[in-house]
Amino acid sequence: MFPMVTKFMNYGQQTVRAARYIGQGFIITLSHANRLPVTIQYPYEKLITSERFRGRIHFEFDKCIACEVCVRVCPIDLPVVDWKLETDIRKKRLLNYSIDFGICIFCGNCVEYCPTNCLSMTEEYELSTYDRHELNYNQIALGRLPMSIIDDYTIRTILNLPEIKT
């Protein structure tokens, strides 16, 4: 008879433990129920990206000295730098610079290590196209500054700030 009593006690303890776990999950569910939805209506509403957002790379052709540091620090050797050595002035002259954003992982190493700061990250993140070859940007396409979301009057901007609980 004694083993039968311990089985009932274990069953009772397991029942109480299961009810407690279910109650904890229910409390978490109820705490999430009173939050505001996070969804936005994308084409008409856009989040303002943070200052350190890593979007499309902006390139300034005049500042580049063709040192190829960006190629060496890139984990996938992505930037294509074509240059010609000018023998009369003993300097490299940049001929072509291109980045394929279909392959780029937006790590920011090229921007970080560029000695002349000719590369910078913009807040542009809409790079989708129907043809993947359109994602190969040359120095002309990289030199264009993106249109700011804030300046577009057709788009309602939403600040992406964390809520402060009081």
UniProtKB/Swiss-Prot annotation:
Top EC class, one word: translocase
Entry-linked InterPro entries: 4Fe4S_Fe-S-bd, 4Fe4S_Fe_S_CS, NADH_quinone_OxRdtase_chainI, NDHI
Catalytic activity: a plastoquinone + NADH + (n+1) H(+)(in) = a plastoquinol + NAD(+) + n H(+)(out); a plastoquinone + NADPH + (n+1) H(+)(in) = a plastoquinol + NADP(+) + n H(+)(out)
Cofactor note: Binds 2 [4Fe-4S] clusters per subunit.
Binding site for [4Fe-4S] cluster 1: C64, C67, C70, C114
Compartments in which it is found: Plastid, Chloroplast thylakoid membrane
GO molecular function: 4 iron, 4 sulfur cluster binding; iron ion binding; NADH dehydrogenase (ubiquinone) activity; quinone binding
Domain 4Fe-4S ferredoxin-type: from-to ranges: 55-84, 95-124
NCBIfam families per the UniProt record, alphabetical: ndhI, NuoI, PRK05888.1-3
Protein name, UniProt field: NAD(P)H-quinone oxidoreductase subunit I, chloroplastic
Organism: Palafoxia arida
Record gene name: ndhI
